[in-house]
Amino acid sequence: MTAPQNPLERVTLRNPIHFLALGLGSGLLHPAPGTWGSLVGVVLGALLLPWLGAKTFFILTALCFFLGIWLCERTSHDMGVHDHGSIVWDEIVSVFLVLLAVPQVSLFWCAAAFVPFRLFDILKPYPIRYFDEKLTNGFGIMVDDILAAGYSILVILALAHFI
């Protein structure tokens, strides 16, 4: 029996590693699975941040980052493709980080976190593209989105200053 040619045939949502790496299944939505994963991150973050508080939410985000290195590496390996578009755990965790910079959890500020993050994640300005191309492991999958989150946080801080 030969291995499946489609990388998505090599993963299953019944596997908890794949389920998390694929963003609770959101990475299987089309078009633009990264956008769907980011939206899941905004919704989860908007629910968890007020409930946990900023300090605990930051700790959770850091733990999710380190867990994500392993989840994304394993799932990429299982798929036979580095950073397949359906792997969106990195988007979810990075949006969590952006939400930590918003002055309040509201529809406006959630959108203000979501939009620049997606733009930076898609456009990949320097050094995001460099790390995206050079680091071909779980850390690489996670770090390019964390850098996009960093740029997004700068946008949030500027926006908060002027509003």
Spans of features found by a protein language model:
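Interhelical loop and helix-boundary elements at the membrane-water interface
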Residues: 2-37, 70-98, 119-150
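Short, surface-exposed acidic-centric catalytic microdomains
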Residues: 31-44, 56-72
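Membrane-interface alpha-helices
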Residues: 42-43, 47, 139-141
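Helix-coil boundary and interhelical linker segments in multi-pass alpha-helical membrane proteins
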Residues: 45-59, 98-111, 157-163
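Alpha-helical transmembrane segments of multi-pass membrane proteins
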Residues: 46, 61-70, 99, 113-122
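Strongly charged, low-complexity linkers/loops
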Residues: 104-112, 117-124, 128
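Final/C-terminal transmembrane alpha-helix of multipass membrane proteins
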Residues: 145-161
